[in-house]
Amino acid sequence: MIMFCVQCEQTIRTPAGNGCSYAQGMCGKTAETSDLQDLLIAALQGLSAWAVKAREYGIINHDVDSFAPRAFFSTLTNVNFDSPRIVGYAREAIALREALKAQCLAVDANARVDNPMADLQLVSDDLGELQRQAAEFTPNKDKAAIGENILGLRLLCLYGLKGAAAYMEHAHVLGQYDNDIYAQYHKIMAWLGTWPADMNALLECSMEIGQMNFKVMSILDAGETGKYGHPTPTQVNVKATAGKCILISGHDLKDLYNLLEQTEGTGVNVYTHGEMLPAHGYPELRKFKHLVGNYGSGWQNQQVEFARFPGPIVMTSNCIIDPTVGAYDDRIWTRSIVGWPGVRHLDGEDFSAVIAQAQQMAGFPYSEIPHLITVGFGRQTLLGAADTLIDLVSREKLRHIFLLGGCDGARGERHYFTDFATSVPDDCLILTLACGKYRFNKLEFGDIEGLPRLVDAGQCNDAYSAIILAVTLAEKLGCGVNDLPLSLVLSWFEQKAIVILLTLLSLGVKNIVTGPTAPGFLTPDLLAVLNEKFGLRSITTVEEDMKQLLSA
């Protein structure tokens, strides 16, 4: 059987249409896994439909609330490639739905939900049979009837909500819960399960998702800073230190903290990778002296870099790609919603097996000459620099700020972001976040009167800090955010980036430049609407974009 998936930047693009629709997607996801993810999403939409009904009776099931976004997160690009685990999530969704339904019926014997997914049942235990059932829920099944524009808007909402669900899970792990957010999530997820076809309603939904995600990022920020302190500027070594080692990748700071606690005194050093790099800025994480540095570059290079790492690797969230290519599948471990067939999975927070493996391996034989980069410009630090920024602007020492961030990826056109960073004039500042920073974060940019010209604000969700800084600067200057000498040049790859974009648009931020390509699910008509309404456009050349942004 074949699949249909168009959710990431590397999706197949042909004159006949966009989307991976063969036996395997560009990410390595098989048609079986992709189709079963469609089935899981349908089950989750049914679960959310009953969660909405339950709230009408004052019933809030926290097991449902914690499970639903987490399971949805498992369908995000480069998270879970393990078909049996995807089916397991679908079964759990249905079991939770039935329990919630029973709670509703206990209050009202006539309780009903008008949603096509509300009573979904899996037809078999056989993966092949389930894959055939999943064909009923492939996202483009009614494309001929509704047209590409409606399909594109549906997918914009679905993928945006998926990105928000990922951030909800990150926040939940840190003990953060907001009933209003979960109620809104279930309402939107259930509505998407009705296969809506009204263009205006879908556009409004996309903005609602963006507004909801701003609240999600707020509680995630509260969770991270509440547990680990506010990030402050910190130098991080990106070269090897002699000794046994473990590499941890993803976004989950709690997993990193637990690993650091459990490795303390064992002689095993811990390195961050990818989106874990900003962890070094948090006081409660950097206090561990055996958190010795950051290893590697963008996630897309992991098959080469992980193969060279002389210790085990722990993946806490996206992005994982085929570990068999580099023959390190026997020493990579998955956590939480991450999965790869045949790779060992850690069900709980006990890393003893990983530590034991690290102690049996050689580790790095010698320490390399250190190369230090600076991270840790979190929200509090950024706000503390607001007056300095305003002073530099008023004295014409600082001409412009570029927010240059987002996802990294393998496409060659992404070298644009390196070229853009190195072309930024000396009297301008670069604010960066997310893994797109690996395109330029080891280069030297100097400073403006002691203020670094390259300011690393953190992970992708730390777009929240950048937004708060922009709002604060606008308030202090008595203008709107769009009137600031600030331009956003964003790279995208997956669904977290989509919801960050929706968040910015929902807040009224205009004239954002994105690349390296437009999302494959957005038609020329939809891109024209976004351009007309928000000034959103794609990158062209560094020279033309720089000229236009500096003259705006």
UniProtKB/Swiss-Prot annotation:
Keyword DNA-binding appears in the UniProt entry: no
Binding positions (hybrid [4Fe-2O-2S] cluster): H251, E275, C319, C407, C435, C460, E494, K496
CDD domains in the cross-refs: HCP
Cofactor: [2Fe-2S] cluster; hybrid [4Fe-2O-2S] cluster
Gene Ontology MF: a single term: peroxidase activity
Record Pfam families: Prismane
InterPro entries found in the cross-reference section: HCP/CODH, Hydroxylam_reduct, Prismane-like_a/b-sand, Prismane-like_sf, Prismane_a-bundle
Record-level GO BP terms: response to hydrogen peroxide
Highest taxon above the source species: Bacteria
Localisation: Cytoplasm
Entry note: cofactor: Binds 1 [2Fe-2S] cluster. Binds 1 hybrid [4Fe-2O-2S] cluster.
HAMAP family xrefs: Hydroxylam_reduct (MF_00069)
PANTHER family tied to this protein: HYDROXYLAMINE REDUCTASE
Designated name of the protein: Hydroxylamine reductase
Native species: Escherichia coli O1:K1 / APEC
